[in-house]
C-alpha cells in the first residue's frame, strides 16, 4: 500500500485507543485546531510505529485496568520522552502502571456533568488549565477511580466525587484527567486539548487542507511516476469526486475515472455525474453500463453480506475489463487503483474492540482493493485515507468544486442495492429510487438539505395491508432515514416536523406504484448503522 502519510510532514499527536466510543472525537478536536492527530489501537507497539509523535494521548475505555485481560499500552511509549495525557481509563492506566493498588472500583459511578476546581502549583504543572478561569464544567463517565495519588504527582483538579479528577507529574509533562475534554458536554475541553497539544507538546498548527493539497499532489506524482496510469471508481458522491479531482490535478488524463452503472443508482445519476465530472471538472471519465450484469447476479440473493460480496466482486470484474481497454489505448500500464477511503472507515477497521465481531463488511475498505491488488497486480492509492468527512469537503472547496456538489450527501458504493432489504430486483430498485427522489427533493425544497448529514429512502418488501381507492391492497413499505452527524461515527435521527413527514408520506404513497405505507427510522448510531444493510 502506498503509505506516505501526514505524520511524516506535520507535527502529530498520537491517540492510543482503549475502546472508548469517544476516542475518534479526540482526533477530530485536535484537527479542528489545525494540529494533526492520528489514532491507533492501544495494542500498537512502539517498535512498529516508524515515526515519533509530538505527544501521546491515552483514551478512555470500558475496561477496568486492574482486571485480568485489561488492555495496557506498550511500556516503551512511556520511555519515549514526549508529553502524555491520560483521559479517563488513560488516567487510570498511568496510575496503575506505577502501582497496582492505585486504582479501585468506585463506591458510586460518576456519569454526567461535574464542576472541576483547578489547583495551581506553578511551572509546567499549570499549563494544562491555562486560559481556563474559574470552575470548569466537565463530563464524567466512569465507575473506577484513583484510590491513591501516584508517587511523584500533584493533584491539579478535583470534583465533588473525584478527589483526583486531574493530576500532573511534578517534573515530567505527564498528565491525567478523569473527565472527557473531547465531548461537547465539556465546554472548555477544546482549550484543554489545545493547551496539551500546542502549549505542552509544542505541536505547530499547520494542518490545513491548503497545505495538504500541495503535499499530496507531490506525493501522488512521486508514487505514480511520469508515465504511470491510475484507474479509479467514481460515483458522483463527495469522496470519489474529490479524490478524482485531486488525482486529475496531480497527473491529468493519466487518471482514468470509471463510473459503473450497476442498475442501482439514484434517479438520472449517471447523466448528472457525467456532466459534472467531464464538463465542469475536466476529469477523464468512462461510463460503463453494467446494470443487467449486476441485477442478474443479485437475483435470489437475500443475505446482506452476500449482496455486498457479490457487488464488490462484480465491480472488480468490470474494473479489470476496463483496465485492459485503457492499457490497450494508452501509453502506459495501469498500475494503480484509486480508492476514496476516509479516516472514519479506517477507524472502524482499526479501533480496539477486544473480542468483538465485524458488524458488516465496509464497502470502502478491504475486498475490492485486495482483489485488484492480488489478481490484477494493481497498487492501491488512497489520498483521502487520513481525512474526516468535513476535511474532505474543505479539500473539495479548495480544489474549486461547487458548493452544491461538495455538500452532497454520501451515497454507498453498492447503491440502492443495500437500501432494498432482501432480494434486489429491478422493480424494487425503481420503487426505492422514486421514493428517494421525492424525499430528497422535498428536503431541498424545505431548505434543510444542508442541515442533514445523510438522507435516503429504502424499501422493505415485507409488505403491509393498506386501503387505496376503497380497495384492500397488500403492498411494500418505504423506510425513510435521515441523520444529523458531524463525522458519521455517531449519528442521531433528524427531527423532522410531523407536517413535513406527513407530506412526504402522502406523495410517496400516491406517486410510487406498489407502496402503501411509509415509516421514518428514528434509530441513532449506535445502535443502528446509517445504511440499512
UniProtKB/Swiss-Prot annotation:
Pathway this chain belongs to: Purine metabolism; GMP biosynthesis; GMP from XMP (L-Gln route): step 1/1
Gene Ontology annotations for the cellular component aspect, listed alphabetically: cytosol
Compartment list: Cytoplasm, Cytosol
Main location: cytoplasm
Main enzyme class: ligase
Binding site for ATP: 235-241
An individual GO BP term: GMP biosynthetic process
Reported function: Catalyzes the conversion of xanthine monophosphate (XMP) to GMP in the presence of glutamine and ATP through an adenyl-XMP intermediate.
Name of the protein in its database record: GMP synthase [glutamine-hydrolyzing]
Organism: Emericella nidulans (strain FGSC A4 / ATCC 38163 / CBS 112.46 / NRRL 194 / M139)
Gene name in the database record: gua1
Amino acid at each position: 500500500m502506498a503509505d506516505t502519510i501526514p505524520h511524516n510532514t506535520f507535527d502529530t499527536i498520537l491517540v492510543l485507543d482503549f475502546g472508548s466510543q469517544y476516542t475518534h472525537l479526540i482526533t477530530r478536536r485536535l484537527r479542528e485546531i489545525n494540529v494533526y492527530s492520528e489514532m491507533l489501537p492501544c495494542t500498537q507497539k512502539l517498535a512498529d510505529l516508524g515515526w515519533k509523535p509530538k505527544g501521546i494521548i491515552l483514551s478512555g475505555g470500558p475496561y477496568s485496568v486492574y482486571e485480568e485481560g485489561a488492555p495496557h499500552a506498550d511500556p516503551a511509549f512511556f520511555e519515549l520522552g514526549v508529553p502524555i495525557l491520560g483521559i479517563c481509563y488513560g488516567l487510570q492506566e498511568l496510575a496503575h502502571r506505577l502501582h497496582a493498588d492505585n486504582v479501585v472500583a468506585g463506591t458510586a459511578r460518576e456519569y454526567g456533568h461535574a464542576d472541576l476546581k483547578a489547583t495551581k502549583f506553578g511551572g509546567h504543572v499549570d499549563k494544562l488549565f491555562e486560559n481556563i478561569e474559574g470552575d470548569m464544567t466537565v463530563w464524567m463517565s466512569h465507575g473506577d477511580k484513583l484510590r491513591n495519588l501516584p508517587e511523584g504527582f500533584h493533584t491539579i483538579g478535583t470534583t465533588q466525587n473525584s478527589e483526583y479528577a486531574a493530576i500532573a507529574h511534578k517534573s515530567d509533562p505527564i498528565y491525567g484527567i478523569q473527565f472527557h475534554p473531547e465531548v461537547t458536554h465539556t465546554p472548555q475541553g477544546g482549550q484543554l486539548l489545545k493547551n496539551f497539544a500546542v502549549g505542552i507538546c509544542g505541536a505547530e498548527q499547520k494542518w490545513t487542507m491548503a497545505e495538504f493539497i500541495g503535499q499530496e499532489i507531490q506525493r501522488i506524482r512521486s508514487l505514480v511516476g511520469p508515465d504511470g496510469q491510475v484507474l479509479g471508481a467514481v460515483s458522483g458522491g463527495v469522496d470519489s469526486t474529490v479524490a478524482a479531482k485531486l488525482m486529475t490535478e496531480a497527473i491529468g488524463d493519466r487518471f482514468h475515472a470509471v463510473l459503473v452503472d450497476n442498475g442501482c443508482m439514484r434517479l438520472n445519476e449517471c447523466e448528472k455525474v457525467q456532466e459534472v465530472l467531464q464538463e465542469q471538472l475536466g476529469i477523464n471519465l468512462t461510463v460503463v453500463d453494467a446494470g443487467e450484469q449486476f441485477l442478474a447476479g443479485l437475483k435470489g440473493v437475500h443475505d446482506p453480506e452476500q449482496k455486498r460480496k457479490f457487488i464488490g466482486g462484480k465491480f472488480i470484474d468490470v474494473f479489470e475489463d476496463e483496465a485492459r481497454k485503457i492499457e490497450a489505448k494508452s501509453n502506459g500500464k495501469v498500475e494503480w487503483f484509486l480508492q476514496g477511503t476516509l479516516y472514519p472507515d479506517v477507524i472502524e477497521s482499526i479501533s480496539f474492540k477486544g473480542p468483538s465481531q465485524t458488524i458488516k463488511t465496509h464497502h470502502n475498505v478491504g475486498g475490492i482493493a485486495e482483489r485488484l491488488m492480488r489478481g490484477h497486480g494493481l497498487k492501491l492509492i488512497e489520498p483521502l485515507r487520513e481525512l474526516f468527512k468535513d476535511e474532505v469537503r474543505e479539500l473539495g472547496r479548495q480544489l474549486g468544486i461547487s458548493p452544491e456538489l461538495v455538500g452532497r450527501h454520501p451515497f454507498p458504493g453498492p447503491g440502492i442495492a443495500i437500501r432494498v432489504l432482501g432480494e434486489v430486483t429491478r422493480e424494487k430498485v425503481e420503487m426505492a429510487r422514486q421514493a428517494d427522489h421525492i424525499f430528497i427533493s422535498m428536503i431541498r425544497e424545505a431548505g434543510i438539505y444542508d442541515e442533514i448529514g445523510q438522507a435516503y429512502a429504502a424499501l422493505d418488501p415485507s409488505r403491509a395491508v393498506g386501503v387505496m381507492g376503497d380497495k384492500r391492497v397488500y403492498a411494500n413499505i418505504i423506510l425513510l432515514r435521515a441523520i444529523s452527524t458531524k463525522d458519521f461515527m455517531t449519528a442521531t435521527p433528524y427531527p423532522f416536523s410531523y407536517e413535513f413527514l406527513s407530506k412526504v408520506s402522502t406523495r410517496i404513497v400516491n406517486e410510487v406504484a406498489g407502496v402503501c405505507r411509509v415509516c421514518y427510522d428514528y434509530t441513532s448510531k449506535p445502535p443502528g448503522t446509517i445504511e440499512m444493510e
